[in-house]
Amino acid sequence: MFKHLRPVWAEINLDNLASNMKHIKELSNTKEIIGIVKADAYGHGALDIVPTLIENGATALAVAVVSEGVELRRGGIECPIMVLGFTPPSLIDMLLKHDIEQTVFSLDYAKELSKAAEKMHKVAKIHIAVDTGMGRIGFLPNEQSIQDVKAISMLPNIKIKGMFSHFSTADEKNKEYSAYQLNQFNKFYEGLKRENVNIETRHISNSAAIMDLPETIFEGVRPGIILYGYYPSNEVDKTKLELKPVMQLKTNVVHIKKIPSGEYISYGRKFKTDRESLIATLPVGYADGYTRLLFGKAKVIINGQLAPVVGRICMDQCMVDITDIKGDIKVGEEVILIGEKNGVKIDADDIAEMLGTINYEVICMISKRVPRVYIKNGEVIKVRNYI
């Protein structure tokens, strides 16, 4: 498709992204929409999709590590950016230099932030993480933690911007544990209010909670997977939110040949032809994020029809049986590995089911060896070739 690229690419539909963002904004109906763009925006290319998010309702961004935030700042992104995870003390200067907000879950760490901020004549903006039942980072919701956060609020050069927690089961039909977590969160907030600790923005709503738990929408929400067109599970109420997948993974046929019956395909002799077969080679493999765990399960879309991947997926190539595909398939034919054409689809949900994992992992797996091609109004507006 693209003369200057290898014949494997991920198409990123910015119109679908904009549509998802608009629907999320409408459903959330709150002040702060913190778009989750960690892991390079779940594999979609953070620098290239953030402008679309901001244009359509995102007011802030969240990343997992400080380097992701720095990349956005260097790319000209000026809106608030917070780090959801831990930033080592050795990288605090980087946080402050680029005006990136930091998650805090201990008094000692806050003191280090305060010292560094004083030294640099900066104000460290922070979000207090509360562990309401995830067992991950965060203050436990008890009296000692309330006193610690009060002490943090009094440190020089520290500004508490928000307080947040994370649901562990909001994407499940049974919301009992989510109700427990919400209660813990609310009690902790009331404890801070009692101590006159000012919290500007409470945010606990993840993708599933935005859809199913309107009572968790406070001053802010944190949409993640739903930005990219996928539901967090099959147990959420999908009627609440219309989503369109943003990414398609495509390639081209690079070789076709007839293989006699009784011949082996790929490593390990795990697949043997039981008839004369027409085999197409695709220049995509597990180094691109098309995992070899799909052996014996994967299908691709070619000429609007499904064709099975045969033999083990190699690091850089895989083979497809196109014997039963109608039409004259030639070298250069477009193949869809993740996506849809003429009502035939293989999406990240389908692949996740084959692998026994979640759609998040499938789209995050697409490696930076795969160029990202950005589509708007049906036209290519940008290509990001990482290598």
Curated annotation (Swiss-Prot):
The keyword Heme does not apply. The active site is at residues 38, 267. It catalyses: L-alanine = D-alanine. One of its GO terms (cellular component) is cytosol. It is an enzyme of class 5 (isomerase). One of its GO terms (biological process) is peptidoglycan biosynthetic process. SUPFAM superfamilies: Alanine racemase C-terminal domain-like (SSF50621), PLP-binding barrel (SSF51419). Its EC number is 5.1.1.1. The modification N6-(pyridoxal phosphate)lysine is found at residue 38. The keyword Isomerase applies. Keywords: Isomerase, Pyridoxal phosphate. InterPro entries: Ala_racemase, Ala_racemase/Decarboxylase_C, Ala_racemase_C, Ala_racemase_N, Ala_racemase_pyridoxalP-BS, PLP-binding_barrel. It comes from the Bacteria. SMART domains: Ala_racemase_C. Its cofactor is pyridoxal 5'-phosphate. Substrate binds at residues 136, 315. Catalyzes the interconversion of L-alanine and D-alanine. May also act on other amino acids. Belongs to the alanine racemase family. This is Alanine racemase.
